[in-house]
């Protein structure tokens, strides 16, 4: 799919990729597609996340293959990304088509994680919104100066970008969760943004709507450990406990470490009745501050399809244990 999308370009490709780290086989396929685009005269640019000289967050962010990126016939800019990550996974093609979702361009992302890919074809208005966000990153090389693109509806779609509209996005998702009358379905590695966490706790307690979802249990436990240390945000813990005790399951992924597999539950989806939010955005306070993107899609068929995907994922795993497995 990646090579096919690149092969469809005739004029421009702009890549905003948080993590770009491929093994020999996949590297050959993707690099060959980029090489063919270069031979066709396609102008290509890439922004990617790199470490910033600041205290390392827990867990630490992924590191792209800078040597691979430098070897490609693409103009590139590294965006310093700690504590606020350049977390996008999108491509804009020919000012008309957009590839986005939760999928990093890594072998583990493609083979070991739950992820979602969204392709928006032939929609210049949505593509323009993504181009504006890309240009902000390209011009400023600063996460905090990006995401200032107005979230306007275009034919049932609305593109959201953070950090410029991070808090607005959390508020919008929270509002639609609260207004839902039939279903709320969520996949997110963590759920820590106050508006969403509080609203979920309320609707689960009220039992007014069918709520269910899946998280990454390992990352949730890491959040609990952080909150036990940082008492300024400890107030969120009872809300998280209430939500996780509801109809949520969790994947016990491999803890992050040098040389470990990255097999996280990585999809980022929120379905509220017939509206879906999907993209790179974890439902987290950090997500509000990162460079992220989300598509808000008002389409019943897409909502049905992604709600079914959430149910498929959550059926694979058991209840969320906030204490590490085996600890008493």
Task: State where each predicted segment sits.
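Extracellular glycan-binding segments that recognize GlcNAc-based cell-wall polysaccharides
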Residues: 22
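Active-site cradle of extracellular carbohydrate-active enzymes
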Residues: 146
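A short, well-ordered alpha-helical element
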Residues: 1-7, 175
């Amino acid at each position: 799919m990646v090579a096919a999308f690149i092969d469809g370009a005739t004029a421009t490709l702009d890549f905003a990729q948080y993590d770009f780290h491929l093994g020999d086989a996949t590297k050959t396929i993707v690099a060959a597609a980029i090489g063919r685009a270069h031979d066709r005269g396609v102008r290509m640019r890439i922004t990617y996340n790199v470490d910033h000289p600041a205290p390392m967050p827990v867990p630490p962010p992924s590191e792209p293959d800078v040597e691979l990126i430098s070897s490609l016939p693409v103009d590139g800019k590294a965006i310093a990304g700690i504590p606020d990550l350049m977390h996008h996974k999108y491509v804009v093609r020919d000012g008309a088509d957009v590839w986005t979702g939760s999928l990093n361009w890594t072998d583990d992302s493609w083979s070991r994680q739950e992820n979602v890919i969204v392709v928006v074809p032939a929609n210049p208005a949505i593509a323009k919104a993504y181009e504006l966000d890309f240009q902000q990153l390209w011009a400023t090389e600063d996460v905090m100066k990006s995401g200032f693109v107005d979230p306007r509806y275009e034919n049932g779609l609305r593109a959201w970008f953070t950090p410029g509209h991070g808090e607005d996005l959390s508020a919008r998702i929270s509002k639609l969760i609260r207004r839902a009358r039939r279903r709320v379905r969520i996949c997110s590695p963590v759920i820590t943004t106050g508006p969403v966490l509080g609203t979920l706790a309320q609707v689960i307690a009220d039992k007014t709507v069918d709520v269910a979802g899946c998280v990454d249990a390992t990352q949730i436990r890491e959040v609990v450990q952080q909150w036990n240390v940082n008492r300024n945000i400890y107030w969120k813990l009872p809300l998280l406990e209430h939500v996780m005790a509801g109809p949520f399951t969790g994947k016990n992924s491999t803890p992050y470490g040098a040389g470990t597999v990255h097999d996280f539950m990585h999809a980022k989806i929120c379905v509220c009745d017939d509206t879906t939010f999907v993209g790179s955005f974890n439902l987290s306070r950090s997500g509000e501050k990162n460079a992220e993107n989300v598509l808000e899609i008002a389409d019943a068929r897409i909502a049905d399809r992604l709600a079914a995907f959430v149910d498929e994922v959550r059926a694979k795993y058991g209840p969320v244990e906030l204490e590490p497995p085996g600890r008493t």
